[in-house]
A protein has these predicted regions:
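Short acidic-hydrophobic surface loop/beta-edge motif
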Residues: 90-98, 167-169, 207
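Active-site-proximal loop/helix segment associated with metal-binding centers of metalloenzymes
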Residues: 106-142, 183-184
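Hydrophobic, aromatic-enriched interface-forming segments
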Residues: 127-172
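Glycine-rich phosphate-binding loop signature in dinucleotide/nucleotide-binding domains
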Residues: 17-22, 96, 149-152, 206
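Core catalytic region of metal-dependent phosphoesterases/phosphodiesterases
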Residues: 3-86
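Active-site environment of divalent metal-dependent phosphoester hydrolases
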Residues: 4-9, 33-36, 57-63, 109-111, ...
């Protein structure tokens, strides 16, 4: 999830995935914005992912009402990629080892409403509205095309907050793979740049089980952290004409 135009980090994660012989890849949105290669990231995700979901940044830059604004990212990715991002689904679900797993970018209510079990003012960097009751993550909503007659998930996964975690809630599971492109530890470095060697590790989650099976079987979750050449991405950023690169 949350590659945010960081092609260097994406390639490192995809290489790790390849080495583990993982056979299905799902991206939870926010392919673009913040880093310098949104075009390459979109193309790579289209090539390797089985499913790509829409994120709030994808929608914000590509929505029709801002088409005429001179957004750097939208100009770079072009109209065809913009339309592709707008066509992405808001959720995806499947059975694995007898569990119904539902995925979305932020919540079943919107692209930017957040739940964070480790929530603090420091973590809420975007000022998004907060979900305080995790039960809401399992609800069927019109936003994701569900009715009250549809089955509710046993497991939900989402991105957006760049904070990797796996937690249990009332015999159900909530997980967040963190961010490939901008790990939360990097965002939380203080003004004195007191980061450590783990601050720039990309993250993703592996779910292992019997895909598309409604029969109860073993299932596991593994959080993976992957180093990448951040200096290359910094050089690309410094050499770009990205208006917000000083941030």
């Amino acid at each position: 999830s949350d590659v945010h135009g960081n092609i260097t980090a994406l390639n490192a994660v995809l290489n790790d995935i390849k080495n583990r012989n993982i056979n299905k890849i799902i991206c939870l949105g926010d392919s673009i914005l913040k880093c310098t290669h949104p075009d390459l990231v979109i193309d790579k995700l289209r090539e390797v992912c089985d499913v790509v979901l829409m994120g709030n940044c994808d929608y914000a830059i590509c929505r029709p009402e801002v088409k005429d604004r001179k957004f750097w990212t939208r100009h770079l990715i072009g109209e065809e990629r913009s339309q592709y991002l707008l066509s992405l689904p808001k959720s995806y679900e499947f059975h694995m080892s007898g569990h119904l797993i539902r995925l979305f970018h932020a919540s079943p209510y919107s692209l930017d409403e957040v739940y964070n079990p480790m929530f603090s003012n420091k973590n809420n960097l975007k000022g998004d509205s907060e979900i305080t009751n995790p039960d809401r993550l399992f609800e069927n909503t019109e936003f994701i095309g569900k009715t009250q007659n549809d089955p509710t998930p046993d497991i939900v996964g989402f991105g957006h907050i760049h904070t990797p975690f796996i937690v249990r809630h009332k015999n159900k599971t909530i997980f967040n793979p963190g961010s490939v492109g901008i790990p939360v530890e990097m965002l939380n470095c203080d003004e004195n740049d007191t980061c450590n060697k783990f601050s720039t590790l990309s993250s993703y989650i592996i779910i292992e089980g019997v895909y598309n099976s409604t029969q109860l079987d073993s299932i596991s979750f593994q959080l993976v952290r992957v180093p990448y050449n951040i200096q290359k991405e910094i050089i690309d950023l410094e050499n770009s004409n990205l208006p917000t690169k000083e941030r």
